[in-house]
Amino acid sequence: MFKEAKLALEDGTIIRGEAFGSETVKTGEVVFATGMTGYVESLTDPSYRGQILMPTYPLQGNYGVTEEWYQSDGIKAEGLIVREMCPAPSHSLSEKTLPEFLEEYGIPGIAGVDTRALTIKIRDKGTMKGALATEEIDDDELLEMAVKQPDITEIDLVDMVCVREPVILNEDASGRVVIVDCGIKRNSIDALLEKDLGVVIVPYTTSPAEIMDYEPDGLLISSGPGDPTRVRDAIDTVKALSERLPIFGICLGQQIIALAFGARIYKMKFGHRGVNQPVKDLRSGTVSITSQNHGFTVDPDSVKGTDIEITQLNLNDGTPEGIEHRELPVFSVQYHPEAGPGPHDTVNIFDRLWMF
């Protein structure tokens, strides 16, 4: 039975389609992600908190859902926009359908949308605030919700997705990495555990002294959602520990490291989200295909005169994809070397943290 869903954008556009998932209304920043697969990993990626996700590939849900692919403890995106929803998934590991998955976590979905046209609109005008309704609501009321919601730069999204208490894994390992959790993905944790490292995951508000009590051999500043300037505690941690520990940053972690050493960050027009972003290493000349999910990036001009340098660039738009301190063992990447979803071209970068 067809049930209408509506998506309102802050520019006044109302898009109608077929509802699936939970019967509710959600607001968020409407973003698109490129890639033919990976909807489970993307929906459960904490970096999508505060955002309504639109995959550009037209068919979604065709291989179902299994918890094995989760990148956190559940869906973190606010909603899902698709061209076509597959009603009968086929995969040996599938435990539930995509609509059932969304309903389980109270998330609305809309199908039958011209996602190509909406992607072009966002590409040309930039990301927009939106409101997605799968329950009855007046168009004007829905549009008002889209327009009046706080900007993503005004919300402490990291606080919504980080751990509340420290988590210790593989405690008896000979080496130990502390993860400053801003929205860590499971694949990042697994990448460290596969190196037989001990892992301690702490809230981003944990003080430098408390971190050092764990006697770590290295520090990982994790990926996560939102505006890095709001994660002041993590910035201060990098400043305090950069001369005492090797530090590695992923995605939001790169932005936090850049801010700690005096560079600036800016919000991108529509960001990088997907599994096919080409990145060039400026030292080796090699090019890797990477998985990315970020709406902020380092201002390359602001790096001049600081103690950090740009080591990798995005080949699509020239934005910084890697930075490194000129003297200290501090480095970072803007992409996701752990994949989940996406290619594993750069997963060996975790080895470098241990080499330090």
Curated annotation (Swiss-Prot):
<feature type="binding site">
    <location>
        <position position="226"/>
    </location>
    <ligand>
        <name>L-glutamine</name>
    </ligand>
</feature>
<dbReference type="GO" id="GO:0006541">
    <property type="term" value="P:glutamine metabolic process"/>
</dbReference>
<dbReference type="InterPro" id="IPR017926">
    <property type="entry name" value="GATASE"/>
</dbReference>
<comment type="similarity">
    <text>Belongs to the CarA family.</text>
</comment>
<keyword id="KW-0547">Nucleotide-binding</keyword>
<dbReference type="GO" id="GO:0044205">
    <property type="term" value="P:'de novo' UMP biosynthetic process"/>
</dbReference>
<feature type="binding site">
    <location>
        <position position="224"/>
    </location>
    <ligand>
        <name>L-glutamine</name>
    </ligand>
</feature>
<dbReference type="GO" id="GO:0005524">
    <property type="term" value="F:ATP binding"/>
</dbReference>
<feature type="binding site">
    <location>
        <position position="252"/>
    </location>
    <ligand>
        <name>L-glutamine</name>
    </ligand>
</feature>
<feature type="active site" description="Nucleophile">
    <location>
        <position position="251"/>
    </location>
</feature>
<dbReference type="GO" id="GO:0004088">
    <property type="term" value="F:carbamoyl-phosphate synthase (glutamine-hydrolyzing) activity"/>
</dbReference>
<keyword id="KW-0315">Glutamine amidotransferase</keyword>
<dbReference type="InterPro" id="IPR035686">
    <property type="entry name" value="CPSase_GATase1"/>
</dbReference>
<comment type="pathway">
    <text>Pyrimidine metabolism; UMP biosynthesis via de novo pathway; (S)-dihydroorotate from bicarbonate: step 1/3.</text>
</comment>
<comment type="pathway">
    <text>Amino-acid biosynthesis; L-arginine biosynthesis; carbamoyl phosphate from bicarbonate: step 1/1.</text>
</comment>
<protein>
    <recommendedName>
        <fullName>Carbamoyl phosphate synthase small chain</fullName>
        <ecNumber>6.3.5.5</ecNumber>
    </recommendedName>
</protein>
<dbReference type="InterPro" id="IPR036480">
    <property type="entry name" value="CarbP_synth_ssu_N_sf"/>
</dbReference>
<feature type="active site">
    <location>
        <position position="338"/>
    </location>
</feature>
<comment type="function">
    <text>Small subunit of the glutamine-dependent carbamoyl phosphate synthetase (CPSase). CPSase catalyzes the formation of carbamoyl phosphate from the ammonia moiety of glutamine, carbonate, and phosphate donated by ATP, constituting the first step of 2 biosynthetic pathways, one leading to arginine and/or urea and the other to pyrimidine nucleotides. The small subunit (glutamine amidotransferase) binds and cleaves glutamine to supply the large subunit with the substrate ammonia.</text>
</comment>
<feature type="binding site">
    <location>
        <position position="293"/>
    </location>
    <ligand>
        <name>L-glutamine</name>
    </ligand>
</feature>
<dbReference type="GO" id="GO:0006526">
    <property type="term" value="P:L-arginine biosynthetic process"/>
</dbReference>
<feature type="binding site">
    <location>
        <position position="295"/>
    </location>
    <ligand>
        <name>L-glutamine</name>
    </ligand>
</feature>
<dbReference type="InterPro" id="IPR002474">
    <property type="entry name" value="CarbamoylP_synth_ssu_N"/>
</dbReference>
<comment type="subunit">
    <text>Composed of two chains; the small (or glutamine) chain promotes the hydrolysis of glutamine to ammonia, which is used by the large (or ammonia) chain to synthesize carbamoyl phosphate. Tetramer of heterodimers (alpha,beta)4.</text>
</comment>
<feature type="region of interest" description="CPSase">
    <location>
        <begin position="1"/>
        <end position="176"/>
    </location>
</feature>
<dbReference type="InterPro" id="IPR050472">
    <property type="entry name" value="Anth_synth/Amidotransfase"/>
</dbReference>
<dbReference type="Pfam" id="PF00988">
    <property type="entry name" value="CPSase_sm_chain"/>
</dbReference>
<dbReference type="Pfam" id="PF00117">
    <property type="entry name" value="GATase"/>
</dbReference>
<feature type="binding site">
    <location>
        <position position="296"/>
    </location>
    <ligand>
        <name>L-glutamine</name>
    </ligand>
</feature>
<keyword id="KW-0436">Ligase</keyword>
<dbReference type="InterPro" id="IPR029062">
    <property type="entry name" value="Class_I_gatase-like"/>
</dbReference>
<feature type="binding site">
    <location>
        <position position="47"/>
    </location>
    <ligand>
        <name>L-glutamine</name>
    </ligand>
</feature>
<keyword id="KW-0055">Arginine biosynthesis</keyword>
<keyword id="KW-0665">Pyrimidine biosynthesis</keyword>
<keyword id="KW-0067">ATP-binding</keyword>
<feature type="active site">
    <location>
        <position position="336"/>
    </location>
</feature>
<dbReference type="GO" id="GO:0006207">
    <property type="term" value="P:'de novo' pyrimidine nucleobase biosynthetic process"/>
</dbReference>
<feature type="domain" description="Glutamine amidotransferase type-1">
    <location>
        <begin position="176"/>
        <end position="356"/>
    </location>
</feature>
<feature type="binding site">
    <location>
        <position position="255"/>
    </location>
    <ligand>
        <name>L-glutamine</name>
    </ligand>
</feature>
<keyword id="KW-0028">Amino-acid biosynthesis</keyword>
<dbReference type="GO" id="GO:0004359">
    <property type="term" value="F:glutaminase activity"/>
</dbReference>
<dbReference type="InterPro" id="IPR006274">
    <property type="entry name" value="CarbamoylP_synth_ssu"/>
</dbReference>
